[in-house]
């Protein structure tokens, strides 16, 4: 049995705002609906919003859902959260916000909060008269999961927004990979690519903000081995290690043999599937840029 919070159970047994908002032609307001999921896949959500046209605020919201305890609770929570928000404010509500409002969801049920976020977005764009295909480029990417019709762009977005690290987590959030399983290797590749890009971005944003001051005599004399080791250690300490430590990892200089720099990856870096990217992007490229373009970094 799933371990649900008291808030989840409360909104499951006594859901708030369940039902339909009828468009009765009330002056000054407009009703819109967003739908996601499908009954065939086991989860479907229809979200209704009533918007005050002049202020662009959501004055009422209700839902209809076909799904489990988490689906009902997530939908009910969302309708409570968005009342009184402008449409632009509501668009900022994430699936994490929905889960936090509920005090957390079992990871295998996180896709219910994702459905809520997507239904809200669909309702708002329907209200604004913008076809979903126009604003949502996720379906333009290559199809990764044929069982649930999930594109590469959607997998990539959900990995980035929720900091996911495994294909199993992706399945829990958007069901991709939960059918025949043939796409799990592709999902792993996407996660790896996201990690590599994140490592490069973190290094540029953090490590590159204050370059190490490398003394320059103006003469192109080769560095002695002692000088080279000292400079490598300086760059590692000042530019590389702070970035890795912030992500739960670290690096230690082990040896320098000519242009071969041997290091020991520690903490999260040592067990991370993207350790090769860490070596090449976060360490080797920085040492080449700061000291010598012929340096090669190897892990021991």
Swiss-Prot record:
This is Nitrogen fixation protein NifU. [2Fe-2S] cluster binds at residues 145, 147, 180, 183. GO terms for molecular function: 2 iron, 2 sulfur cluster binding; iron ion binding. Signal peptide: none annotated. Binds 1 [2Fe-2S] cluster per subunit. The lineage of its organism: Bacteria, Bacillati, Cyanobacteriota, Cyanophyceae, Nostocales. Belongs to the NifU family. It comes from Trichormus azollae (Anabaena azollae). It comes from the Bacteria.
